[in-house]
Every structure is written in C-alpha cells, then in structure tokens.
Amino acid sequence: MLRFDYLLITALAISTVSVVMAQVPPEKQFRVLNEPGYAPYITEYDASYRFLNSPNQNFFTIPFQLMFYNTTPSAYVLALRVGTRRDMSFTRWIWDANRNNPVGDNSTLSFGRNGNLVLAELNGQVKWQTNTANKGVTGFQILPNGNMVLHDKHGKFVWQSFDHPTDTLLVGQSLKVNGVNKLVSRTSDMNGSDGPYSMVLDNKGLTMYVNKTGTPLVYGGWTDHDFRGTVTFAVTREFDNLTEPSAYELLLEPAPQPATNPGNNRRLLQVRPIGSGGGTLNLNKINYNGTISYLRLGSDGSLKAFSYFPAATYLEWEETFAFFSNYFVRQCGLPTFCGDYGYCDRGMCVGCPTPKGLLAWSDKCAPPKTTQFCSGGKGKAVNYYKIVGVEHFTGPYVNDGQGPTSVNDCKAKCDRDCKCLGYFYKEKDKKCLLAPLLGTLIKDANTSSVAYIKY
C-alpha cells in the first residue's frame, strides 16, 4: 500500500513538473509595442489602426489579422480584423480583446516564457490577459477560421478567442449555457464598450434583449427553441457531393443530440417561419462558398450576417441575413428602427406620435420626458394621450402582457411607476403591458390594441 501511494505521488509530481516546465521557446516569444503611426486603408467604424510587427511571430493568417485600432484618441483595442487591404468594401472587426478597457500609445502586447498573453500600459498596468501563465502553453497561432489560440506542445488549445465572443460569431463559433452564453453589442460605432443590446442563450432559447432603463426587455430571437445548451453559427454545403455545384446554407445549429420539435406559437411579428424542424435553424442560402461569414449583433440592436467572397474584384462583403427584414421578422419590430421614437408601418416610419396626434416623422422625434408627472403615490395627476391600433415591440414575446385586467387597473399601475412611459392595452383579451421604453411603435390592424403614452 505504501509503495502504491509512493508511486502515485511520484507520478503526480512528475505530471505537475512537466506542465510547469512546458514553456514557450525563445523563438516564439514576442513583445510588440503599440507605436504611433497609422495604416492608410479604410476599415469598419472609420477606425484608425496599427499593424503588429515581430520577428518571432506572424499576426496575419489570410484573411484574418491581429491589430490595434481606435475610434477615439488614445484609446486602443486589440482586435482581429477580417479582409485584405485591397478590399474596396471595408475590412471588418470581428473580435475585441479589451473593448471595455482600452490602452494608450506605447502600450505592449507580450507573450513570454510562461505562456501568458498580456496587454499592458507603458507603466506596466495590465489591461487584459489570457490568464494562461504556467499552464503548459508553448505557442500562439491565428487559425484560418479566425480563431486565435494558445496551444500546448501537443497542439491542444489552452485558450482560444472562440471561447470569448463579443458582439460577433464566426463560422464554427458557439454560445454555451455552461460558458460564455451571450453576445453584447457595442454602444455605438465610435464607442466600442458594452452597449444596451444582448443576445442570450439559456435553456429556454436564444433571446435578444434591450436594457436602457435597468429592465431587460425581450425584442427578438428564438425564444421557444431548444438548442440543448449550445448554439453554433455554421455554414454548410447544401449538397454533400463535392463534385457538384452547390449553394451554401447559413445555419444556427444546436448541440448534436436527437432533434426535437421546437414549437412556434407566438411569432406575431414574423413574416415567414425562421428555420425548420429538427433543431437546426436555416437563416439563408447563398450561391457561393460563404465559409468566411459572421453573425453580428449591431449597436442598433439589429442581428445580421455578412459573408465574404474573396473572388470578387470589389464589394467582397455582402449582407446575407437580417433578422429584422421584409423576409424574416418585420423591420418595424426593431426597437430603434424609427430612432428613439416613431410610428412604423410596413417598414416605414410614418409618424411621430404626440398629444396632438401623429406628426411627420423625423430623427428628432422623441418620447416625452415623464418623470415629473409620476404621482409617486401622492395623488398627483398623470396625463396620457391615446394611440389606436398599435403594439409594443416586446408584446409578441410576453404574450401581450399580463391579464386579464381592466384598463383602469392597467393605468393605475403605470401611474404609480415612474419608469413607465406608457401602457399598451389589448381590449379584446384585457391584457396590460407597461412600457419603460417606447422606441418604435408598430402599427396593428387590430384597433382593439391601444397605447396610452404619458406626457
């Protein structure tokens, strides 16, 4: 027994030492300086960018490249870009390392003997790292699919960018319930920090949320689809026979288990069914090899896919899927389609609701500021104006609200809630929906669907 314990302890010690001793060889180590100077070609967000240069490391695997970029002065993000400099349509940023914690001029990206990839300021303050020190990392690589990896001596990934998505999924990249389970939008093109829109995978489905008021509101997604814990963005040939011409399909694939019928009983804003039975959702079909594609949650809350056709002489990028479109879910269902506020019908912003009625819409149309009208339980009157035949963007995903209840009770709830900008009432079903955010109001042919907006 003592001999067995001794052998076990010895084996564990040898294993531990072997991991600690597995180090990055000198010829694969690097330290890159974020030096002043900019590259000349156009890129997404109208960003300025800088190349990374090291005699020990290539940061470019066509068409993906690791670079620094900035949209505001002295605030740089380490990011992966897709596209080549000859592209007439601009190259795209598909992964950010430190978008919530940018660095300044002369910051450094270092990959030392211990295998930790570290982004630090000139004074040594660490702004981002992979936390892979002494975990057996022996090399750095950017793969042809856009996955940036740190691997051990056997080629096994110790860390990979595919496990840390920001607002974008590349082909083969996943969201996982037991891992990073969401995409988060940028705040704007100029501000790359986390924005108000997210797409979250849980055991109920893949759901899109907007949170501008402290209350997450559902506005899209596949809320009743069982992805079995994992959803992967994929592009596959329509036909398996490689000798025959084939279209390519953009898919959202669940974990590879026996398929179940996802059901679909509340898709009130949907123009056509999205996806098919069997668990896999078919987003679109394209007539070329779309292996280089990505799915992006935009700063405006949109969900779009873009595909890259490198054989084209210009305009290599094409929008190949849009969740809010004439073909899928109505454009009016996007909360920001009419900006901060507006009345939408058939993909057009046709009016600006006011207490005096519908006025001509412009990008200056804004909801009323109502906090001063909140009664707060003190009996102060709250005024509303009425809009007939309209629904809220979140209505289809919350079964039009709570009920049955009376319109007076619905009003009383909104009166008492300072965050409530208005309420939507379904007269036929006696359903009540309180709205802390208005955004785009959607025309409803059913005149029993009525909105009451505070002013």
Curated annotation (Swiss-Prot):
Q: Where in the cell is it found?
A: Secreted, Cell wall
> Which Gene3D superfamilies does this entry report, sorted A to Z?
Bulb-type lectin domain (2.90.10.10)
Record keywords = Cell wall, Disulfide bond, Glycoprotein, Lectin, S-nitrosylation, Secreted, Signal
Please list the residues that carry the modification S-nitrosocysteine.
374
Q: What happens when the gene is disrupted?
A: Defect in both hypocotyl and cotyledon photoresponsiveness during deetiolation.
Q: What is this protein called?
A: EP1-like glycoprotein 1
List residues of the PAN domain. Answer: 374-455
Extract the PROSITE patterns matched here: BULB_LECTIN (PS50927), PAN (PS50948)
Residue span, Bulb-type lectin domain: 43-163
Q: Which GO terms describe its molecular function?
A: carbohydrate binding
Q: Which organism is it from?
A: Arabidopsis thaliana
What glycosylation sites does the entry record? 106, 191, 211, 241, 289, 446
Q: What superkingdom heads the lineage? A: Eukaryota
